[in-house]
Curated annotation (Swiss-Prot):
Active-site residue numbers: H246 (nucleophile)
Protein family according to the UniProt entry: Belongs to the HIT family.
Inhibition and activation profile: The hydrolytic product 7-methylguanosine diphosphate (m7GDP) efficiently inhibits the decapping scavenger activity and acts as a competitive inhibitor in vitro.
Any single Pfam family the record assigns to this protein: DcpS_C
Keywords assigned: Hydrolase, Nucleus
Functional description taken from the UniProt entry: Decapping scavenger enzyme that catalyzes the cleavage of a residual cap structure following the degradation of mRNAs of the 3'->5' exosome-mediated mRNA decay pathway. Hydrolyzes cap analog structures like 7-methylguanosine nucleoside triphosphate (m7GpppG) and tri-methyl guanosine nucleoside triphosphate (m3(2,2,7)GpppG) with up to 2 nucleotide substrates (small capped oligoribonucleotides) and specifically releases 5'-phosphorylated RNA fragments and 7-methylguanosine monophosphate (m7GMP).
Subcellular location: Nucleus
Annotated residues for binding of substrate: E154, K176, H237, Y238, Q239, P240, S241, F242, Y243, H244, L245, H246, V247, H248
Protein's recorded name: m7GpppX diphosphatase
Reaction catalysed by this enzyme: a 5'-end (N(7)-methyl 5'-triphosphoguanosine)-ribonucleoside in mRNA + H2O = N(7)-methyl-GMP + a 5'-end diphospho-ribonucleoside in mRNA + 2 H(+); a 5'-end (N(2),N(2),N(7)-trimethyl 5'-triphosphoguanosine)-ribonucleoside in mRNA + H2O = (N(2),N(2),N(7))-trimethyl-GMP + a 5'-end diphospho-ribonucleoside in mRNA + 2 H(+)
GO biological process: deadenylation-dependent decapping of nuclear-transcribed mRNA; mRNA methylguanosine-cap decapping; nuclear-transcribed mRNA catabolic process, deadenylation-dependent decay; response to heat
EC number in record: 3.6.1.59
Length: 301
């Protein structure tokens, strides 16, 4: 499932020739996650963004036997029993997981450009007078979301589907996950109901929806991948990258982008808060991080 970007998924597994694109700029990188975000020019003059992430290492004996058989070590230094090398692995183990956003717009470019980050404490009044008007003016297209919900795209990737129009959702892998290493599992639930932008819109009336996503989503993950519910973190982003309610499910050992403090809000915490105070998220000050050039940050300051 696509997360954070607009995309048209056709299910076509044919190779894409990159000769029609040329390098323009490195927007950002993440050395800890071995990721890079590259701005490209296309032959027709439109911009594109390539998100490149090195795949996690395999953990099975067969793969490592093949790696050891087909690899060479290029020496860097040696000191007593300790040696440093560059491991030159076979091509089949050196693929880079990538997502192409094409065509992209200035909002996408700003999203992936490295910037200073700041903490925002958003009061209910701030949300009504600053954040909500910004969302209404600047929401990126949700066509890719509706394509998934309407079975126009990514049908073959659906893990579980609840068809109820009010409390239903679709669970599918996020494009950040290669689908191979379970310790990097990343799937996402998209709610069927339109109009719920984020946790700010949730009330106790939405508890059946949220509990259904949690319970049915975790059961579906266990059935397909064999992972127990205690091995999965389920959370929302606030602010989310797109304003149609969705829930992230990741392996508890995986430090996914934006899964930490001041960005991720646990699904169980949201459920518990709404049970205690039915309109908790309309009354609370919510804390999140924003980039320096983010219009929400500029308006707040």
């Amino acid at each position: 499932m696509v997360d954070e970007v607009d995309a048209n998924s056709t299910g076509d597994n044919s190779l894409v020739n990159m000769k029609g694109f040329s390098f323009k700029e490195v927007l950002g990188s993440d050395s800890a996650r071995k990721s890079a975000f590259i701005l490209l020019d296309s032959s027709n003059g439109e911009n594109a963004i390539l998100l490149a992430d090195k795949n996690a290492f395999p953990v099975d004996k067969t793969s490592w036997s093949a790696i050891l058989t087909g690899s060479t070590l290029k020496p860097i230094m040696k000191n007593d029993i300790y040696s440093s090398y560059t491991l030159c692995m076979p091509n089949e183990f050196s693929d880079v997981k990538s997502t192409l956003i094409y065509p992209c717009n200035e909002k996408h470019i700003a999203k992936y450009r490295d910037q200073k980050r700041f903490i925002i404490n958003e009061t209910p009044e701030d949300y009504r007078t600053i954040t909500l008007p910004y969302i209404q003016r600047n929401q990126m297209s949700l066509e890719w979301v509706y394509n998934i919900l309407d079975h126009k795209a990514e049908v073959d990737r659906i893990i579980y589907e609840e068809t109820d129009p009010h409390d239903g959702f679709i669970l599918a892998p996020d494009l950040k996950w290669s689908g191979e290493q379970l310790e990097c599992l990343y799937v996402q639930a998209l709610v069927r109901r339109k109009g719920i932008k984020s946790i700010r819109d949730l009330t106790a009336n939405d508890l059946p929806l949220l509990e259904g996503i949690r319970d049915k989503g975790l059961n579906a993950i266990k059935e397909k991948y064999g992972l127990d519910k205690h091995q999965i973190r389920a959370y929302f982003h606030y602010q989310p990258s797109f304003y149609h309610l969705h829930v992230h499910f990741i392996h508890v050992s995986y430090e996914a982008p934006a899964s930490g403090v001041a960005k991720a809000v646990l699904l169980d915490d949201v459920i518990n808060n709404l049970k205690l105070i039915p309109d908790f998220y309309q009354r609370s000050t919510l804390t999140f991080t924003a980039k320096e050039q983010d219009p929400i940050y500029r308006r707040e300051n």
